[in-house]
Amino acid sequence: MKKIIFMGRSGSGKTTLIEALKGEDLVYRKTQYIDYSDNFMDTPGEYAEGNDLGGALAVYSYEADVVGLVLCATDDFCIFPPACAPVANRPVIGIVTKCDEPDANLELAKMRLELCGCHRIFFTSSKEKQGIEELLTYLA
């Protein structure tokens, strides 16, 4: 299985997505540091939200085969700048989370990740297990 690093803002669903991918119970816990278990690298949202720790994400991304930009389907904004994906020297995919939420805007999330340069976009719901198998198949 390919190693993947998940990047996104706090509360975007990175940790919950990893729990769903592993088949674990969904239990909220705040990620405080870069957590590498199995083939999944979980990152604190604060690393992506601020300027100070972005370099750490870049360094850790070299340990992964794939970079996953995680964007919540209910977000009113996107922390990733347009055309940021080509900076990585590995595939960058977009992962839209919380697609089961009533106020989810899948088209807007897809457009934002396409503007980032993501070559493939997955739509997921960790609660409903939507898109989990598709993402696992991609990573296999």
Locate predicted features.
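Conserved nucleotide-binding/hydrolysis micro-motifs of P-loop NTPases
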Residues: 45-47, 74-76, 99-102, 127-130
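Short gly/ser/thr-rich secondary-structure transition/capping motifs
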Residues: 23-27, 48-52, 75
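Switch II (G3) loop of P-loop NTPases
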Residues: 36-54, 72
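Inter-motif core of Ras-like GTPase G domains
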Residues: 51-75, 82-93
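Canonical P-loop GTPase G-domain recognition
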Residues: 102-140
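Conserved beta-strand/loop subsegment of P-loop NTPase cores
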Residues: 65-71, 88-100, 115-125
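Conserved G1/Walker A P-loop phosphate-binding module
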Residues: 1-43
